[in-house]
Each structure stands twice: as structure tokens, then as C-alpha cells.
């Protein structure tokens, strides 16, 4: 109450920031008349002038008025569009490391040109991030003429580019890219084996379009580069046959309640849990099928893999639905993004879930993969020096943006007042009554020439509604993951009078629905249109536009509330753009997922009693409050999940950062001999410590074991026992010094044989290969640790602290293993002289001749006997002619046929 009173008097923080930025807008507006008088060449030269001033020490912020005035004037001349004052404010907000909430149709694409140009002046690169490659290409091509006029280069980074094209994209002043491609390029750069194979420059400034979709909705989706793992497709098919015999029970067993089912479902977290009865039933089934022995437990360490497959199959059957969570296309399982309704080609669920769904649907089961490199969007975008974002719906997630990314959300006012009529939600007893009411609403709109956009939350629901509309004889278009290819055309026609469009989670996000239809799309269909044709199309559009405006603009129908208010607002935001009329209404039922999952049975029963007549709808303030509470619960739950993920991933992120930093230093450094020398000294001291404890008595030394270890691991045959007997001054320090001296001497001998350059390259190659292999194994071990760490809570231990402690120990162990493996490999490598190589080649040729003769013998005995007489056969125990010193049977003779 007090806070509201104070805000009314002094204004909110958002209001105060807008007032401050308006002062800058007035300065920019004063410059407009001056910049209009500049010639094109004078306007272009401003870029060089600004860059020179920056090099001379002027701050970037001081250039804002002139730089923005330059972009505004260039935009007027090149694009035929003048950025509004609110767009100038949006540009300044984006430059200030903030998120700009700009309503649909307010020109976010044009707004982005202002901070992009300003930050590109630094020469450090600007990345404009979009949710898909269509938007990346569209925005880049739209703004390219403007930036190139001002002397800036523009690049597009999307999947499928060649290395040269990708390198050129990153070299540009401003690069338009998809979020996933940027993340994967970062991972690929940190798997590169030469500095020239890396693409990304310094991560300076990222401007993220649809920032809520990328940094909130996809925050829990890790980007993973993986390699093949052990195949277990038969096991997935076997476990798939188990699921039909299992019975679900509504809630978990407690002291007061004992159900009769085999498993329970956690719909909020999409997890399944076995009951004791379920475990016993499964164990019996596994014994009958021969998967486990009698009296063997499902939870024994040797059978954990079986349990993993069972849970994957259970989740696949009971928690993931076809045409809701995924579709089957060309014999493959394709994930459907729950937030956008788009298919996510190439993406696969982890933890065996994807394979379990493939088994469920009877398609080919693709092999499991092992993680080679991974990062979340949360941690990737926090690598940028400067991060900003824009969207039409950010204010509801402002707290999370601030907490996780340190980004403040500023709501930008609309250029024209918004006049959309957002009507009260209507609740129905069940889905049938709800759909009946929706059909009636659509009929009314169609009769009045009003276009309708109907939003559904899944492909399944969109097809149910489509069938109902077909029965009612209403023409309509369906936009979901199955009809993704027709998206642009469907959206272009969605604003026509009486047009009815069904969209899954507003999959057409990023494209405006124009009242009366998109006349530019009509022109684009014509080959070389004349001015007369264009004018005819525009005139026809104007009539349709006026008709739709008179009918009330675009009408939005939501078929149920989403878990997040933000997704609902995105749907509503398709209507009422740039001061256009419009309306919206959500139709709900007690069968909706939000109601079933997040409202108690008591509340649902109470609400059912409020319906006195069949098919009646109910709207009230209490209903709005109940829905708001349910959505708040979900948002809080999802935020906790993302925050929890980040806290765990931050541990891995610190380790990832340390490894990648060292790896890049390796790539950039031509000579790592000094590093190898430091590691060698550390490794030998550590090995000697195992057999000769520091400051210990001679009786405690295990010299024979140390001799064996040095010979096996480092190819050093040293007479340590003899040194100890013959030298009275031989002590621990002398031992360490002599061993290291001999090791270095032997290594230098090898280096002299091959040359310094070859040895330096070999050292780097061994270091990189060993590091990559151990890091891959470490990621797998961390993943296993993370999956089971929550069980520590039962022992009254904090799982997060335990994870931090154990993962740190695993990391230090990995580094110790890295050092030992590198020095062991370098010490044991055998160097051959040119003479030895030539002898080996001669021996190889002789062996090949004998093998050919043996093959001829099988076809023609006579010629074979002549050959055998003319050539001496090398005995298996004779020295190999290659000069290696080994017996023939242990060298090239191992490949010969006898």
C-alpha cells in the first residue's frame, strides 16, 4: 500500500529512467535538421570520424547523440523509415546492458540498428542473436543496405556454412546469428586442434532478440556436442515391452496410504517413480526374461543400467505424447519446442529418453552418445562483456533476468496508445463445452469480416479444434510444427477479412500479422511487377484493411492458459499493433492441464459445483485470481528449477572455463617445452614420493618397485639399487636429481633425432589429445555424480555442497592424470632414425612379396614351389630384418602368414 502511494508521487524506477533518456532524445532530435543537410558522403564519413574519436580516448557513451542521429538519417535515406522517439529510447536501453520490453509491431528490428552501429564502432564485433535462421537471414538482409551505406560489414552465421563462410561471418562488424549456432561454435572452437580452426573472436556485445525465449525458456536446455557411445538398442526394445504390464497409482505410498499400483507420476517435473510393488514385479519379469539372476536386486550396482532403461521407457510411455512433445517424421522422432510449437530438427533428448521414445514408436533406434563438450545458454551468454535483449514480453520475468543475468528490464512506451480490448477469461466445465463456445465466437467474427487467430498449446489440440471447425464448415489454416513450411504464407494471410488461423504457441512469432493481409507478400509473388500492378495490390489491400479495422481488428482466442503468463501475453501481443484495434479472450475448462496439475482436488470440486447449467460459461474475479495463483506457482517452480540448474552448472562452468582457457593458451603458443618441463618435474617428484616418502628413513624406501615403475611408465632402465649401494652420499635429493637428469637427457636425445620443430608439434598434439580425452571422461563422471547427488540429502548432507566438494576432487584428480599421461606418452615414444625406417620399409616389402607368393600358391602350386626355393624364409625366432632388435615373430612377423 505504502509502496503504491510513494510510486504515485515520485514515479516508478522505470518512469525515472525514461525521463532521463528523454533528455538524450531531445538532443538527438535537435541534431536532425543539421544531419539532413549532410551529403551522402559526409554522412558516411561520420563512421570514420567516430572510430577516430574512440581511438583517441573518447568514451562510447559520449557518441550516442551523434551516432543515433547518423543512423536515423541514414535509415530515412536507405530504408525509407525514420526511427521514432520511443525507438531511440529502446536503442539507448539496449546499449545500457538492459532488456527493452517493446510491444509487437513497435519496430524492434529497426531499433536494434542503433546500438548495433554504436557498438560496432569499437571494432570488437557485435552479435545479433535470433531464435531461428529464417529471422537471422531476414533481419540481416533488411538492415544490410543501411549498415553498408555507413561503412559497416554484415555477416550471417547459420547452420550449414563452410569454414570460409563462417570465418567471414565472424569477421564482419555486425553478425546476425542463431543462438544455437553461436553456442555450438563456442564448443567447436574449444575442440579445435589448431588456432586457425577457431571462428569466434572476442565475445564483446550480444543483442538477443526474443530474449525471454532464449534466456528463460531454453535456459535448461544444454548445448551438447557428443560422440558415439556403446550401443544398447536391444535393451531399449526389451524394456519397452515391460511397460504395458505396469499399473499406475495416483499418489505415492505413505504410512497412511498404501496403493496397489506399480508406479506414480510427477507431472510437474515429468518424472516417474516406482513403488515397492512395482520393483518386485519388474524384478520378477526380468528374472523370467533372463536379465537378472534369482535373488538379484534391481538396485544392485551391476544392474543400474537396467534401471536407467526402465525409467526411460516409463517416461517415454507415460509422460511424453506424440503430436504434443514430438512428432514422427520420415521414420525419426523430432522434438517439438513446448514454447514455440516449432520442430527442433537435430535435437535429441538425453539420458536415453530419445531412444526409449524411438522404441515406443517402432522407429529405428539411434545409438546413444557420450558428451564431448557442453554448455548451457545461461553460461554461454554470460561470457559476453556486454549483454542486452529485447522482446515484447519480459516484465513478468524481470526478477529472473536481474537475478541470473544482472539485466534490468525497462518497459518502453508504445509509439501510439494501445487500444486492444482484453476481455475477461471464460471458464467451462469441460473441454467439449469450451470448444463449442470457441466455435460460436469464431462464427460471429467470420460473419462480421473479423480475422481470428486461435492459439493452442499443442499440435494435438490444434488438430482437435481443426476437426471441429471442419465439421462446422468454417474455412481455416493450421500453423503448427507439421505445417512449418507454409508458415510465412499462413501468417501473410492471417489478417484477411474473416480469415481463421490456428497456431500452436504462436509459432509465427517474429512476424507481424498485418490487418487486411500483407500486400508486400503479394507483390513478392509476381515476377517483375509493374508500378500499376503494385498500386492495384495496395488499393485492394487498403479496402481490406479498412474493412478489418471497422470489424474490430484481429481477434485473439486462447484455447487454454499456458503455464507462463508471458506465453499468454505473446499470443495477445499479435493483436493491437501500432495503435490498431483488436481484442482477445481466453477460453478455459477444468480439464485444462494447468488446472489438473496445479490446482488441488478440493479447489477443482468446488469450482465444478459452481456450474449449474450444462454448457454455461463462467467469468469472475475469483476465477482470475485462481488462474493467477496457478500460473504464479508454475513460474516459481520453473524459476527454482532454472536457478538450481545454474547453481550446479556454475561448478562445471568454472572447471570448463579453466580447461578452455588453458586449451586456448596451448593453441596460441607455438612452443610448450617450458610447460612440459614443469609438468615432467612435477610428475617425477610425485612418482618418487610414492616409493620414497619425503623425509623418510632409507628402510622405508621401496627401490625395486620404483625401478620397475620407471621402466614400465617412462622407459627408464635405471640401476637405483646399485647407486644406493655404491654411493654413500646417495640420499633422497640426489635420487630425485639423478632420475630427472637422466629423464631430461633421454628426452633431448630423442629431440635431436627428430628436430625441435617436430618435437614441439608432437608435444602439443599429445597434450591436446590427452586433455580432450580426459575432459570427455570427466564430463561423463560429473554427469553420473550429478544424477545421484540428491540422495545425499537423506544423509542430512547438502547435495550442492557435496557436489562442489566431490567435483573439485574429481577435477584435481583429472589434472594429475593429465600430467602423468602426457609425460608417460612422451617418455615411451620410440624414435626411429632414417636408416631404421628404410630397413623397416625393406622388411615390409619382403613380407608383402611372401604374402603374394602364398596367395599364388593357393591358385598355382607349381609357381609357388619355384618361389619358395629361390628365397630364404625368416625364422620366427630370428632377428627382424627391420633393425628393431626384436624377434621377427614379435615385430613384422606378427603380420606374416605361416
UniProtKB/Swiss-Prot annotation:
Binding site residues for ATP: 87, 105-109, 512
Pfam families: P-loop_SecA, SEC-C, SecA_DEAD, SecA_PP_bind, SecA_SW
Gene3D superfamilies per the UniProt record, alphabetical: Helical scaffold and wing domains of SecA, P-loop containing nucleotide triphosphate hydrolases, SecA, preprotein cross-linking domain
Cofactors named for this entry: Zn(2+)
Subcellular location: Cell inner membrane; Cytoplasm
EC number: 7.4.2.8
Biased composition range(s): Basic residues: 886-898
Reaction(s) catalysed (UniProt annotation): ATP + H2O + cellular proteinSide 1 = ADP + phosphate + cellular proteinSide 2
Region (Disordered): 855-898
GO MF annotations in UniProt: ATP binding; metal ion binding; protein-exporting ATPase activity
HAMAP family the UniProt entry points to: SecA (MF_01382)
Protein name: Protein translocase subunit SecA
Native organism: Histophilus somni (strain 129Pt)
Gene (name only): secA
Amino acid at each position: 500500500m505504502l509502496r503504491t502511494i510513494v510510486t504515485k508521487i515520485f514515479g516508478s524506477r522505470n518512469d525515472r529512467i525514461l525521463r532521463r533518456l528523454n533528455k538524450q532524445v531531445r538532443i538527438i532530435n535537435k541534431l536532425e535538421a543539421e544531419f539532413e543537410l549532410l551529403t551522402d558522403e559526409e554522412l558516411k564519413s561520420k563512421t570514420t570520424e567516430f572510430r577516430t574519436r574512440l581511438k583517441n580516448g573518447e568514451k562510447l557513451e559520449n557518441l550516442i547523440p551523434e551516432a543515433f542521429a547518423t543512423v536515423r538519417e541514414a535509415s530515412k535515406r536507405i530504408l525509407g523509415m525514420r526511427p521514432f522517439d520511443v525507438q531511440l529510447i529502446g536503442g539507448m536501453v539496449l546499449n545500457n546492458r538492459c532488456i527493452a520490453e517493446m510491444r509487437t509491431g513497435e519496430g524492434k528490428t529497426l531499433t536494434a540498428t542503433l546500438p548495433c552501429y554504436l557498438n560496432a564502432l569499437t571494432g570488437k564485433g557485435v552479435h545479433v542473436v535470433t531464435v531461428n535462421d529464417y529471422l537471422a537471414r531476414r533481419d540481416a538482409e533488411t538492415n544490410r543496405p543501411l549498415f553498408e551505406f555507413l561503412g559497416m560489414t554484415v555477416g550471417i552465421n547459420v547452420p550449414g556454412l563452410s569454414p570460409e563462410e563462417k570465418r567471414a561471418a565472424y569477421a564482419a562488424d555486425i553478425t546476425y546469428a542463431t543462438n544455437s549456432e553461436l553456442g555450438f561454435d563456442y564448443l567447436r572452437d574449444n575442440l579445435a586442434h589448431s588456432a586457425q580452426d577457431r571462428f569466434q573472436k572476442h565475445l564483446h556485445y550480444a543483442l538477443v532478440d526474443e530474449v525471454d525465449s532464449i534466456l528463460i525458456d531454453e535456459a535448461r536446455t544444454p548445448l551438447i556436442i557428443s560422440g558415439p557411445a556403446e550401443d544398447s538398442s536391444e535393451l531399449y526394445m526389451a524394456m519397452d515391452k515391460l511397460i504395458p504390464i505396469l499399473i499406475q497409482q495416483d499418489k505415492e505410498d505413505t504410512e497412511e496410504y498404501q496403493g496397489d499400483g506399480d508406479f506414480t507420476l510427477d507431472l510437474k517435473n515429468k518424472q516417474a517413480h516406482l513403488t515397492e510393488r512395482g520393483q518386485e514385479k519388474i524384478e520378477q519379469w526380468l528374472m523370467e526374461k533372463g536379465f537378472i539372476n534369482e535373488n538379484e536386486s534391481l538396485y544392485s550396482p551391476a544392474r543400474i543400467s537396467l534401471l536407467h532403461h526402465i525409467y526411460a521407457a516409463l517416461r517415454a510411455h507415460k509422460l511424453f505424447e506424440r503430436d504434443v512433445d514430438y512428432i514422427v517424421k520420415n521414420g525419426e522422432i523430432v522434438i517439438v519446442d513446448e514454447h514455440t510449437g516449432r520442430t527442433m530438427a537435430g535435437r535429441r533428448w538425453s539420458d536415453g529418453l530419445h531412444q526409449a521414445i524411438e522404441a515406443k514408436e517402432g522407429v529405428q533406434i539411434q545409438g546413444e552418445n557420450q558428451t564431448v563438450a557442453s554448455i548451457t545458454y545461461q553460461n554461454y551468454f554470460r561470457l559476453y562483456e556486454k549483454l542486452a535483449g529485447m522482446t515484447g514480453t519480459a516484465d513478468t520475468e524481470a526478477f529472473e533476468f536481474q537475478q541470473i543475468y544482472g539485466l534490468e528490464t525497462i518497459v518502453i512506451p508504445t509509439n501510439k496508445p494501445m487500444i486492444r480490448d482484453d476481455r475477461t477469461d471464460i471458464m467451462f466445465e469441460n473441454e467439449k463445452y469450451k470448444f463449442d463456445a470457441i466455435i460460436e465466437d469464431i462464427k460471429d467474427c467470420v460473419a462480421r469480416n473479423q480475422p481470428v487467430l486461435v492459439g493452442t498449446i499443442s499440435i494435438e489440440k490444434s488438430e482437435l479444434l481443426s476437426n471441429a471447425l471442419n465439421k462446422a464448415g468454417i474455412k481455416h489454416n493450421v500453423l503448427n510444427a507439421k505445417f512449418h513450411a507454409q508458415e510465412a504464407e499462413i501468417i501473410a494471410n492471417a489478417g484477411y477479412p474473416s480469415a481463421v488461423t490456428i497456431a500452436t504457441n504462436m509459432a509465427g512469432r517474429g512476424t507481424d500479422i498485418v490487418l487486411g493481409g500483407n500486400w508486400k507478400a503479394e507483390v513478392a509473388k509476381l515476377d517483375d511487377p509493374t508500378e500499376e500492378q503494385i498500386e492495384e495490390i495496395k488499393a485492394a489491400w487498403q479496402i481490406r484493411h479498412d474493412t478489418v479495422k471497422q470489424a474490430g481488428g484481429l481477434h485473439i482466442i486462447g484455447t487454454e492458459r499456458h503455464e507462463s503468463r508471458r506465453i499468454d501475453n505473446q499470443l495477445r501481443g499479435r493483436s493491437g499493433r501500432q495503435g490498431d484495434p483488436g481484442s482477445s479472450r481466453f477460453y478455459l475448462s477444468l480439464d485444462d492441464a494447468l488446472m489438473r496439475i496445479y490446482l488441488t482436488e478440493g479447489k477443482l470440486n468446488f469450482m465444478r459445483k459452481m456450474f449449474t447449467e450444462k454448457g454455461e460459461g463462467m467469468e469472475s474475479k475469483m476465477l482470475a485470481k485462481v488462474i493467477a495463483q496457478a500460473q504464479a506457482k508454475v513460474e516459481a517452480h520453473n524459476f527454482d528449477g532454472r536457478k538450481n540448474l545454474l547453481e550446479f552448472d556454475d561448478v562445471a562452468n568454472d572447471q570448463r572455463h579453466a580447461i578452455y582457457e588453458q586449451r586456448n593458451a596451448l593453441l596460441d603458443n607455438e612452443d610448450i617445452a617450458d610447460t612440459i618441463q614443469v609438468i615432467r618435474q612435477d610428475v617425477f617428484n610425485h612418482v618418487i614420493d610414492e616409493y620414497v616418502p619425503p623425509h623418510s628413513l632409507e628402510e622405508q624406501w621401496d627401490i625395486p618397485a620404483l625401478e620397475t615403475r620407471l621402466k614400465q611408465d617412462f622407459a627408464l632402465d635405471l640401476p637405483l639399487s646399485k647407486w644406493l649401494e655404491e654411493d654413500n652420499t646417495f640420499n633422497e635429493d640426489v635420487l630425485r636429481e639423478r632420475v630427472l637428469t637422466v629423464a631430461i637427457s633421454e628426452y633431448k636425445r630423442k629431440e635431436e633425432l627428430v628436430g625441435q620443430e617436430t618435437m614441439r608439434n608432437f608435444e602439443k598434439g599429445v597434450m591436446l589429445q590427452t586433455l580432450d580425452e580426459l575432459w570427455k571422461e570427466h564430463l561423463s563422471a560429473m554427469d553420473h555424480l550429478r544424477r545421484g547427488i540428491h540422495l545425499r540429502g537423506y544423509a542430512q548432507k547438502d547435495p550442492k555442497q557435496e557436489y562442489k566438494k566431490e567435483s573439485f576432487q574429481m577435477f584435481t584428480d583429472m589434472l594429475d592424470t593429465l600430467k602423468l599421461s602426457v609425460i608417460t606418452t612422451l617418455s615411451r615414444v620410440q624414435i626411429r632414425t632414417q636408416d631404421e625406417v628404410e630397413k623397416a620399409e625393406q622388411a615390409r616389402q619382403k613380407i608383402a612379396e611372401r604374402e603374394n607368393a602364398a596367395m599364388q600358391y593357393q591358385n598355382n602350386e607349381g609357381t609357388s614351389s619355384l618361389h619358395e626355393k629361390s628365397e630364404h624364409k625368416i625364422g620366427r625366432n630370428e632377428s627382424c630384418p627391420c633393425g628393431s632388435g626384436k624377434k621377427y615373430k614379435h615385430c613384422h612377423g606378427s603380420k606374416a602368414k605361416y
